[in-house]
């Protein structure tokens, strides 16, 4: 493999694909993991219509398309669509030839084995890459924060994980996974707006709600206290939001009621434990000797951890759960929305990592199962 070929780093999330070149400090392209198929093929004579649209283009034309997400809860469910997303990433977004660059892909923890094999197969057979590697998202987030031991609380659009890592090795028996993340909060926000008399129902309107959620929501340090405040002095929590058509709407207690579901999933009718309990249970599944280090290195990652005050609230909740003398430290890096990608960029540009790649020769010799031997 030529020395000068820079690796490509592609972080496939349920909501967004983050991609770019190894060594950069931020992804070059970020676009929604969406495929759009026209509802009425070729209805417009003389209009050039594609068979399918990917990413932002699908987002912009969503009125005439049926939208599909090939990655559900962090796991690829439709490989043909996934291949289209990768094709779009390489050729339209990054504008590179994949056969000239090694590619680092990311995967969810506890990913089915067949999924990793299929990823490997598509990279070598459809894109003809010279080398590739698959890394678990949480490890990359930890590397990006400059640590090798800690518990990563990664919450994106489709899935939330708590992953304990010791000296760079994931402890798989202690991973907790909840299929409750950003997308569920967006749906909950839509429901809260309905109660206020605003209706948002279509996929197009869902994107507006997602934007409101990302711009205006925050975590209450004390939920009951905040509710009381919002009832007594509404103006303290109210904010205005301008819709695309120019109308203004008022957003009030929804601002903290929506993300509260992270700590209390029963608000949205889910039986799973809250974020703090999931993290605590993960730590308790680990050896007693390393728990202290984990409590002291709780690293947040992913877009759904971007709410204001989430670090403080998590610290309070964990302090209540942990043994009295335990020191709790929550690390919330400002760039945590992209920390998986940043960790991938760091890892793939290390000189010591270059011998870790799965090469085309190794793949031709062993087939897709090589991924389990080389990527762990």
Curated annotation (Swiss-Prot):
It is found in: Cytoplasm; Cytoplasm, Cytoskeleton. PANTHER family: ACTIN. It comes from the Eukaryota. Its main location: cytoplasm. Pfam families: Actin. Its EC number is 3.6.4.-. Actin is a highly conserved protein that polymerizes to produce filaments that form cross-linked networks in the cytoplasm. Polymerizes into longer and more stable actin filaments compared to ACT1/actin-1. Has ATPase activity. ATP hydrolysis leads to the formation of a stable intermediate ADP-inorganic phosphate (Pi) actin, which is followed by the release of Pi. ATP hydrolysis affects filament stability; ADP-bound actin depolymerizes much faster than ATP- or ADP-Pi-bound actin. Disulfide bonds: none annotated. The lineage of its organism: Eukaryota, Sar, Alveolata, Apicomplexa, Aconoidasida. ATP binds at residues 14-16, 18, 157-159, 213, 303. ACT1 and ACT2 differ in their polymerization, filament stability and helical structure. Unlike mammalian actin, Apicomplexa actins do not form long and stable filaments. The keyword ATP-binding applies. One of its GO terms (cellular component) is cytoskeleton. Belongs to the actin family. The gene is ACT2. It catalyses: ATP + H2O = ADP + phosphate + H(+). Monomer (G-actin). Oligomer (F-actin). Polymerization of globular actin (G-actin) leads to a structural filament (F-actin) in the form of a two-stranded helix. Unlike for mammalian monomeric actin, monomeric actin is able to induce oligomerization with ATP or ADP. Mg(2+), which is used to coordinate ATP, is required for polymerization. ATP hydrolysis occurs in the polymeric state. Unlike for mammalian actin, ATP hydrolysis also occurs in the monomeric form and the release of inorganic phosphate (Pi) is more efficient. GO terms for molecular function: ATP binding; hydrolase activity. Keywords: ATP-binding, Cytoplasm, Cytoskeleton, Hydrolase, Methylation, Nucleotide-binding. This is Actin-2. The modification Tele-methylhistidine is found at residue 73.
């Amino acid at each position: 493999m030529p020395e000068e070929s820079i690796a490509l780093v592609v972080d496939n999330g349920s909501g967004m694909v983050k991609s770019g070149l190894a060594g950069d400090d931020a992804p070059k392209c970020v676009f929604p993991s969406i495929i759009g198929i026209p509802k009425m093929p070729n209805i417009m004579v003389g209009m050039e219509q594609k068979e399918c649209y990917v990413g932002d283009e699908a987002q912009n034309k969503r009125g005439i398309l049926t939208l599909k997400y090939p990655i559900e809860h962090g796991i690829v469910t439709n490989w043909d669509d996934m291949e289209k997303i990768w094709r779009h990433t390489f050729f339209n977004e990054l504008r590179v030839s994949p056969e000239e660059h090694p590619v680092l892909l990311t995967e969810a923890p506890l990913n089915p084995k067949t999924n990793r094999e299929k990823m490997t197969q598509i990279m070598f057979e459809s894109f003809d890459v010279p080398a590739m590697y698959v890394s678990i998202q949480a490890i990359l987030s930890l590397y990006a924060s400059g640590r090798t031991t800690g518990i990563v609380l990664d919450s994106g659009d489709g899935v939330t994980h708590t992953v304990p890592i010791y000296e760079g090795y994931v402890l798989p028996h202690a991973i907790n996974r909840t299929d409750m993340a950003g997308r569920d909060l967006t749906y909950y926000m839509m429901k809260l707006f309905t109660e206020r008399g605003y209706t948002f129902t279509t996929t197009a309107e869902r994107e507006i709600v997602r934007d409101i959620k990302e711009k205006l929501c925050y975590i209450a340090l004390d939920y009951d206290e905040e509710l009381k405040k919002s009832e007594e002095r509404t103006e303290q929590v109210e904010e205005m939001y301008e819709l695309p058509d120019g109308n203004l709407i008022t957003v009030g207690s929804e601002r903290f009621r929506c993300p509260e579901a992270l700590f209390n999933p029963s608000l949205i009718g889910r039986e799973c434990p809250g974020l703090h309990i999931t993290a605590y249970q993960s730590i308790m599944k680990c050896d007693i000797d390393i728990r202290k280090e984990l409590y002291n290195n709780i690293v947040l990652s992913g877009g759904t951890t971007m709410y204001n005050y989430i670090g403080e609230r998590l610290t309070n909740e964990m302090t209540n759960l942990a043994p009295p003398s335990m020191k709790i430290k929550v690390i919330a890096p400002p760039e945590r929305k992209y920390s998986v990608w940043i960790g991938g960029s760091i890892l793939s540009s290390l000189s010591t990592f270059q011998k870790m790649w799965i090469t085309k020769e190794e793949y031709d010799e062993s087939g897709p199962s090589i991924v389990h031997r080389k990527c762990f």
